[in-house]
Amino acid sequence: MVEKPKKINIAFNGFGRIGRNLVRKLISDDRYNIVAINARTTVNVRAHLFKYDSVHGMFAGDVSFELDNLIIDGHTIPNFSRKMPARLPWKELEVDFVIDSTGKFTNKHDLEQHIEAGAKNVIVTSPAKDVDATLVYGVNETSYKVQETNIISASSCTTTCLTPILKVLLKNYGIKQGTMTTVHSFTMGQALLDSSHPDLRRARSATMSII
């Protein structure tokens, strides 16, 4: 009898737009086991934001919470609110991958806190300095040699959109130079109304601006 492959244990640090969307995707995938979520908000707020999404609509499954656990379609996920990754129980939870989508930890030194806490690998969902690799699916994901521990950046949304096109152009025609423009939906970094901000471009109303 062939044994089923061991599920990959995944923990989330950050439960904003990226974190919630990834949990929506992975919660029903039998290859993965979501073992923890660490974020600033309380578990009841996490349950509400996960269930009701203004962009993607209401989650079709069951969502509830009990004590410090988020329960999604019968999966009980322990929740934490710890500021420093080094204090998270990744070793006890046997975490294979931490997905860090906080946007706060953007260099290898800071992200290594997850490894110190017991995680085997870290994927950061933003550009990051000095990491083991920056991988863009469809461009260079097969070029990376897996190590015992890995801290990998998934690059940025603009990079992910642009580099597959550049790869085709470079391979078939060559590129001497170029310029590009991104039209981006507004994010948490912009205010709905004009307000003070160190970056005056971000001080203007997001709904009235082309980001």
Q: In which residue ranges do the predicted regions lie?
A:
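Short, intrinsically disordered, charge-balanced linker/junction segments flanking boundaries
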Residues: 206-211
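N-terminal Rossmann-like NAD(P) cofactor-binding subdomain of oxidoreductases
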Residues: 2-202
